[in-house]
From Swiss-Prot:
Organism of this sequence: Saccharomyces cerevisiae (strain ATCC 204508 / S288c) (Baker's yeast)
Domain of life: Eukaryota
Bias kind Polar residues: ranges: 1-11, 1017-1038, 1057-1082
Matching SMART domains: KISc
InterPro entries linked: KIF11-like, KIF11-like_kin_motor_dom, Kinesin_motor_CS, Kinesin_motor_dom, Kinesin_motor_dom_sf, P-loop_NTPase
Assembly and binders: Might be dimeric.
Identification of the protein by name: Kinesin-like protein KIP1
Binding site for ATP: G141, Q142, T143, G144, T145, G146, K147, T148
Pfam families to which the protein is assigned, alphabetical: Kinesin (PF00225)
Gene3D superfamilies, sorted: Apolipoprotein (1.20.120.20), Kinesin motor domain (3.40.850.10)
The Kinesin motor domain, residue ranges: 52-410
C-alpha cells in the first residue's frame, strides 16, 4: 500500500522541521472550518438532522484512601451493557426514597476495561471524522475519578514501532493513543492521499498554552503578549472561533503522534492533593485534523481532486474539587477556584442549552468558548462522566450525574465540512506566504510597526466613528440653514396673524351685544329647566311613594304567608310532640296496669293459699280431736283389759296420721311452688312481649317524628331561600341606586362639560341636529320595543318555569307526607292487631289452669266419694280462683283494646290535621305563585317617570338658538384663552338641583343580574351609530350618558317620555321581578348606544301605544 503525505510532496521544509507555526482555526469546536476560502460546488456540507449529545458514565472501583477510610459503596451498575446507574443515599429511609436511578446511553462499571470504553465511545467517531464530520469527546467529573486515565492512560508503545499494523498498546492505554493507532490503520486501508496534523492546547488559570511548543515555562518569550495564544471570532462563520498562535504538527505515523502526546503530557500542570497524588490542574484539548484527497466523480476525465477535512477534539477537563477536602492552600486554592469557576460556567451553559434560554454564557470562560461549537453547535459530541463509588464523594457524584443528565438533552446539528480542491488550497497557501513575507519585510525595513489585533480593531472603529461624526456635522449645518429659512417665514406669518388678530378683536367687540342677548335667552331656558326639574322630582317622589307602598304591601303579604307557614309547621310540631307524649303516657299506663294486675293476682293467690292451708289444718285438727276423744273414751273403757295392746295401736295410728299430714303438707307446698313459678314465668313473658311491642311502637313513632322533622327542615330551607331572595333583591336595588347615582354624576359632569364646550361647537350641532332628530327617534323606539319584547318573553319564561318548579316541589312534599301518614297508620293498625292477638292468646295459654286442674284431680283421688268432693272447700276455692283469673284476663284485654282504640283515634286525628295543614300550605304556595304571576303580568308594562321630558325639552330649547343666528364667539376677547370665558357666571345655573337617588330604587335592579346570563344569548348585536359616515355623531353636543364603558357614546336626542300621557299610567308601581326587569329595559330605552332597525314591530299594545305617543 503506497501512501504519501501532502506536506512531504509540497515542500521540503515540512520534511525537515515536521512542524509549522500558523494562525488558523484548529478544530470545529474551536472554529467551523480552518480556511476562509470559498468551497467548490461538489460538497457544500449538507447538515444532518438534530441529534442529542451521547453521554456515558464510567464508575471506577474504590481507591486506597477510600478503603482505608472504610467508606461504603453507594453506586450500583447493571453490568457491562447496562444503561442505568443507581445512587443510594445510605440512609435508613424507605427503599423508594433512599435510591435514585439515572439513565444514560451506556454505563461502565468497575469491571469495564479501557478497550471496552474505547470501542463503545470513541471508535465510531474515527469513521465519522474520516467522512468529514467534526467530532468532540471530553471527560467530565470530580478530581480523582479517572478522567486522565480514561483519555490518556498508559502511553507506552509495544510491538513494532515502524509498522502500523503491528503497533501495540498496553491494556491501560486510553482513548487518545487508541484513536491515533486506529486512525492510521483506517487511513492505510483507504489507499488515498492524506495528511494528519495534531495540536495540543492547555487552559491553566484562564490562560492558553501550546503544549507542543519548544519553549519552556521559564522562557521569557512565553510571557510575551505578542506571542500569547488568543481566541477570536471567525468572521467567515458566526458560530465558531479562531485560535491565533497555536502550532499544528503534521505526523506520518501513530508513533510520532504518541511521542508528541507524551511530550505535551509531561508539560501539563499536575499537583498532589489529598484526593489525588497526580491531580490535573488544567484543561487540555488534543485535536487531530485529517485531510483526505478524493477525486470528484462528476468530473469526466478532468482529474480534479478535492480535500475532505475532518477533525476530532479530545478534551480532558480538570476535576472539580472541594477545597476543604483536597487541602489546597494559597496557589493551589486559587487554581481550584479558577477550575471550579470554569466548570461552573460549563454547567450554566448546559443548563441554558437545556432550558432553551435566549442567552448562552459562552464568553464567561475560555473553556466554554473553546467548547462553544461542541455544545449546541455543528459537531458530534460525546461526554464521558467519571464518578467515584464511595459514600464520602456522594455529593460530587450526585452533582456529576445531574449535569450529565441535563447534558443528555442538548441537541447538536452535525454538518459535513466543506471539501476544498488542491488548487484552492495552493492558492490560499501562496497568499498566506506572500502576506507573511510582506509583514517580515516591513518589520525589517521598519516601514511599519507591529500592532496587535485589538489595536487594529480599535483603530478601524475610531476611523469609522470619525466618519460618522463628520456626517453628523454636515447634517447639522444643513439643518441650521433650514431653521434660518423657517424662522424668516415664521416672522412673516406672525405679522399676518397679528393683523388678523386686530380684525378679530374688532369683530368680537361688535358681537358682545349679541352675546348678552343670547345670555338672557339662556337664563330663560334655565328657569324653564328648573321648573321642569322640580315637576320631575315631585312626580318621581310620588311614584316612588306608591311603589314603596306596593312593595311594603307585597312584603307584608310575603311575611304573612311565611308566618302562616311557620304557624302551621309549629302546630304540626306541637301536635307531633303531644302525640309522642300521649303515646309515652299510654305505654306507661299499660305497663303500670299490667304490674298492678300481676300484683293483685299474686296477692289473691297468696290469700287463697293461706285460706286453703287454714281450712285443711282446721279439718285435720278437728279430726284429730275427735279421734283423741274417741281414743280416750275407748281407753277409759278398755283400760283395764288391754292397756298395752291399745297403747301400741294408738301409737301406730298416731304416727301414721302424723306421717300423712307431713306428706300432705309437702305436696301442698310443692304445688304452691310450681304454681308460683309458672305464674312468674308467664308474667315475665307477658312483660317481655309488651316491651318488644312498645319498642316497635317507639321506633315507628321516631320514624314518624324524623319524617316530620325532615319536612319541617325542608319548609324552613324554602323559607330561608325566600328570605335570601328578598335580601338579594334589596342588595341589587342598592347596586342599581349606586349605578343611577353614578349616571347622575356623569350626567352632571357631562352638562357642565357641554356648557364649557357649548361656545365651540354650537353652530355645528344646530346644522345637523334638526335633520337627524326624527329619524333617530324612530330608530331608537323601534329597536327598544323589539328588545323590550324579547327580554320580556325570556323573563316571563324564566319566572314561569321557576314558579312551576316550586309548585311541583310543593306537590311532591305533600305526596311524601301523605304517603308517610298512610304507612304510619297501617303500621299502627297491624301492630295493634298483632298485640291484641298476642296478648289474648298468651293470657289464655297460661299454665296456671293446668296446675289447678292437677290439684283438683289429686284431691278428688284422695277423697274418693262424690259427696266429699262436692263439699270439699279446697275444690271450691280452686274453682273460684279460676273464675277470678278468667274475669281479670277479660278485663285486662278490654282495657288494652280500649287503649289501642284511643291511640288509633289519636293517630287518625293527627294524620287528618297533617293533611289539613299540608293542604293549607299547598294553597298558600299556589296563592303565592298566582299572586306573583298575576302581579308580574299586570305590572309588566309599568314604567316609572324619568328625566326624559327634561332632556328632550332642553334639547328643543337648544334648537331655538339656530333661529337666533348668533355667533357666540363674538362675546370673547382673543387676548384671553377661550376656556376662561366659556362658562357664564350666573347664580341661577349654579342653583340646579342635584339628581339624587330615589328612595327604594332597588326594585329597578332586582331582575338585572338574574337574567343577564339567560338573556345574553337572545340579544341581537346592533352596530354602533358612530361608524356611519353619513351621520357624524361625534360632532354632536351635548352627549347622552350611556352606561356602556366599552363603546363610543353617540350624540343623540332624547325622545319624549311616555310620562306625557298621564292617563295611560297605572296607579300601581312595579315591585316584582318582572317590573324590575321592566325598569332595566326602560333605562336601556332611554340610555343606549344601539340603534333601532326599521321594519321591526311587536305585538305588545302598550309598547305600540307609547311609541305613538312619542311620535
Amino acid at each position: 500500500m503506497a501512501r504519501s503525505s501532502l506536506p512531504n510532496r509540497r515542500t521540503a521544509q515540512f520534511e525537515a522541521n515536521k512542524r509549522r507555526t500558523i494562525a488558523h482555526a484548529p478544530s470545529p469546536s474551536l472554529s467551523n472550518g480552518m480556511h476562509t476560502l470559498t468551497p467548490p460546488t461538489c460538497n457544500n456540507g449538507a447538515a444532518t438532522s438534530d441529534s442529542n449529545i451521547h453521554v456515558y458514565v464510567r464508575c471506577r472501583s474504590r481507591n486506597k484512601r477510600e478503603i482505608e477510610e472504610k467508606s461504603s459503596v453507594v453506586i450500583s451498575t447493571l453490568g457491562p451493557q447496562g444503561k442505568e446507574i443507581i445512587l443510594s443515599n445510605g440512609s435508613h429511609q424507605s427503599y423508594s426514597s433512599s435510591k435514585k436511578t439515572y439513565q444514560f446511553d451506556q454505563v461502565f462499571g468497575a469491571e469495564s476495561d479501557q478497550e471496552t470504553v474505547f470501542n463503545a465511545t470513541a471508535k465510531n467517531y474515527i469513521k465519522e471524522m474520516l467522512h468529514g464530520y467534526n467530532c468532540t469527546i471530553f471527560a467530565y467529573g470530580q478530581t480523582g475519578t479517572g478522567k486522565t486515565y480514561t483519555m490518556s492512560g498508559d502511553i507506552n508503545i509495544l510491538g513494532d514501532v515502524q509498522s502500523t499494523d503491528n503497533l501495540l498498546l498496553g491494556e491501560h492505554a486510553g482513548i487518545i493513543p487508541r484513536v491515533l493507532v486506529d486512525l492510521f490503520k483506517e487511513l492505510s486501508s483507504l489507499n488515498k492521499e492524506y495528511s494528519v496534523k495534531i495540536s495540543f492546547l492547555e487552559l491553566y488559570n484562564e490562560n492558553l498554552k501550546d503544549l507542543l511548543s519548544d519553549s519552556e515555562d521559564d522562557d521569557p518569550a512565553v510571557n510575551d503578549p505578542k506571542r500569547q495564544i488568543r481566541i477570536f471570532d471567525n468572521n467567515n462563520n458566526n458560530s465558531s472561533i479562531m485560535v491565533k498562535g497555536m502550532q499544528e504538527i503534521f505526523i506520518n505515523s501513530a508513533h510520532e503522534g504518541l511521542n508528541l502526546l507524551m511530550q505535551g503530557s509531561l508539560k501539563r500542570k499536575v499537583a498532589a492533593t489529598k484526593c489525588n497524588d497526580l491531580s490535573s490542574r488544567s484543561h487540555t484539548v488534543f485535536t487531530i485534523t485529517t485531510n483526505i484527497v478524493e477525486q470528484d466523480s462528476k468530473d469526466h476525465g478532468q482529474n480534479k481532486n478535492f480535500v475532505k477535512i475532518g477533525k476530532l477534539n479530545l478534551v480532558d477537563l480538570a476535576g472539580s474539587e472541594n477545597i476543604n477536602r483536597s487541602g489546597a492552600e494559597n496557589k493551589r486554592a486559587q487554581e481550584a477556584g479558577l477550575i471550579n469557576k470554569s466548570l461552573l460556567t460549563l454547567g450554566r451553559v448546559i443548563n441554558a442549552l437545556v432550558d432553551h434560554s435566549n442567552h448562552i454564557p459562552y464568553r464567561e470562560s475560555k473553556l466554554t468558548r473553546l467548547l462553544q461549537d461542541s455544545l449546541g453547535g455543528m459537531t458530534k459530541t460525546c461526554i464521558i462522566a467519571t464518578i467515584s463509588p464511595a459514600k464520602i464523594s456522594m455529593e460530587e457524584t450526585a452533582s456529576t450525574l445531574e449535569y450529565a443528565t441535563r447534558a443528555k438533552s442538548i441537541k447538536n446539528t452535525p454538518q459535513v465540512n466543506q471539501s476544498l480542491s488542491k488548487d484552492t488550497c495552493l492558492k490560499d497557501y501562496i497568499q498566506e506566504i506572500e502576506k507573511l513575507r510582506n509583514d517580515l519585510k516591513n518589520s525589517r525595513n521598519k516601514q511599519g510597526i507591529f500592532i496587535t489585533q485589538d489595536q487594529l480593531d480599535l483603530y478601524e472603529s475610531n476611523s469609522i466613528l470619525i466618519d460618522e461624526q463628520n456626517l453628523k456635522i454636515h447634517n447639522l449645518r444643513e439643518q441650521i440653514k433650514k431653521f434660518k429659512e423657517n424662522y424668516l417665514n415664521q416672522l412673516d406669518i406672525n405679522n399676518l396673524l397679528q393683523s388678523e388678530k386686530e380684525k378679530l378683536i374688532a369683530i368680537i367687540q361688535n358681537f358682545n351685544v349679541d352675546f348678552s342677548n343670547f345670555y338672557s335667552e339662556i337664563q330663560k331656558i334655565h328657569h324653564t329647566n328648573l321648573e321642569l326639574m322640580n315637576e320631575v322630582i315631585q312626580q318621581r317622589d310620588f311614584s316612588l311613594e306608591n311603589s314603596q307602598k306596593q312593595y311594603n304591601t307585597n312584603q307584608n303579604m310575603q311575611l304573612k304567608i311565611s308566618q302562616q307557614v311557620l304557624q302551621t309547621l309549629n302546630t304540626l310540631q306541637g301536635s307531633l310532640n303531644n302525640y309522642n307524649s300521649k303515646c309515652s303516657e299510654v305505654i306507661k299506663g299499660v305497663t303500670e296496669e299490667l304490674t298492678r294486675n300481676v300484683n293483685t293476682h299474686k296477692a289473691k293467690h297468696d290469700s287463697t293459699l293461706k285460706s286453703l292451708l287454714n281450712i285443711t289444718t282446721n279439718l285435720l285438727m278437728n279430726q284429730m280431736n275427735e279421734l283423741v276423744r274417741s281414743i280416750s273414751t275407748s281407753l277409759e273403757i278398755f283400760q283395764s283389759d288391754s292397756t298395752s295392746h291399745y297403747r301400741k295401736d294408738l301409737n301406730e295410728i298416731y304416727q301414721s296420721h302424723q306421717q300423712f299430714l307431713k306428706n300432705l303438707q309437702n305436696d301442698i307446698k310443692s304445688c304452691l311452688d310450681s304454681i308460683g313459678s309458672s305464674i312468674l314465668t308467664s308474667i315475665n313473658e307477658i312483660s317481655q312481649n309488651c316491651t318488644t311491642n312498645l319498642n316497635s311502637m317507639n321506633v315507628l313513632i321516631e320514624n314518624q317524628q324524623s319524617g316530620s322533622s325532615k319536612l319541617i327542615k325542608e319548609q324552613d330551607l324554602e323559607i330561608k331561600k325566600l328570605k335570601n331572595d328578598l335580601i338579594n333583591e334589596r342588595r341589587i336595588s342598592n347596586q342599581f341606586n349606586q349605578q343611577l347615582a353614578e349616571m347622575k354624576r356623569y350626567f352632571q359632569d357631562h352638562v357642565s362639560r357641554t356648557r364649557s364646550e357649548f361656545h365651540d361647537e354650537l353652530n355645528k350641532c344646530i346644522d345637523n341636529l334638526k335633520d337627524k332628530q326624527s329619524k333617530l327617534d324612530q330608530d331608537i323606539w323601534q329597536k327598544t320595543a323589539s328588545i323590550f319584547n324579547e327580554t320580556d318573553i325570556v323573563v316571563n319564561k324564566i319566572h314561569s318555569d321557576s314558579i312551576a318548579s316550586l309548585a311541583h316541589n310543593a306537590e311532591n312534599t305533600l305526596k311524601t307526607v301523605s304517603q308517610n301518614n298512610e304507612s304510619f297508620t297501617n303500621d299502627l293498625i297491624s301492630l295493634s292487631r298483632g298485640m291484641n292477638m298476642d296478648i289474648s292468646s298468651k293470657l289464655r295459654s297460661l299454665p296456671i289452669n293446668e296446675f289447678l286442674n292437677k290439684i283438683s284431680q289429686t284431691i278428688c283421688e284422695t277423697c274418693g266419694d262424690d259427696n266429699t268432693i262436692a263439699s270439699n272447700p279446697v275444690l271450691t276455692s280452686i274453682k273460684k280462683f279460676q273464675n277470678i283469673i278468667c274475669s281479670d284476663i277479660a278485663l285486662t284485654n278490654e282495657k288494652i283494646m280500649s287503649l289501642i282504640d284511643e291511640i288509633q283515634s289519636q293517630i287518625e286525628t293527627i294524620s287528618n290535621e297533617n293533611n289539613i295543614n299540608l293542604i293549607a300550605i299547598n294553597e298558600n304556595f299556589n296563592s303565592l305563585c298566582n299572586f306573583i304571576l298575576t302581579d308580574y303580568d299586570e305590572n309588566i308594562m309599568q314604567i316609572s317617570k324619568t328625566q326624559d321630558e327634561v332632556l328632550s325639552e332642553h334639547c328643543e330649547k337648544l334648537q331655538s338658538l339656530k333661529i337666533l343666528g348668533m355667533d357666540i364667539f363674538t362675546a370673547h376677547s382673543i387676548e384671553k384663552p377661550l376656556h376662561e370665558h366659556t362658562r357664564p357666571e350666573a347664580s341661577v345655573i349654579k342653583a340646579l338641583p342635584l339628581l339624587d337617588y330615589p328612595k327604594q330604587f332597588q326594585i329597578y335592579r332586582d331582575a338585572e343580574n338574574k337574567s343577564k346570563d339567560d338573556t345574553s344569548n337572545s340579544r341581537t348585536c346592533i352596530p354602533n351609530l358612530s361608524t356611519n359616515e353619513n351621520f357624524p355623531l361625534s360632532q354632536f353636543s351635548p352627549k347622552t350618558p350611556v352606561p356602556v364603558p366599552d363603546q363610543p357614546l353617540p350624540k343623540v336626542l332624547i325622545p319624549k317620555s311616555i310620562n306625557s300621557a298621564k292617563s295611560n299610567r297605572s296607579k300601581t308601581l312595579p315591585n316584582t321581578e318582572g317590573t324590575g326587569r321592566e325598569s332595566q329595559n326602560n333605562l336601556k330605552r332611554r340610555f343606549t348606544t344601539e340603534p333601532i332597525l326599521k321594519g321591526e314591530e311587536t305585538e305588545n299594545n302598550d309598547i305600540l301605544q307609547n311609541k305613538k305617543l312619542h311620535q
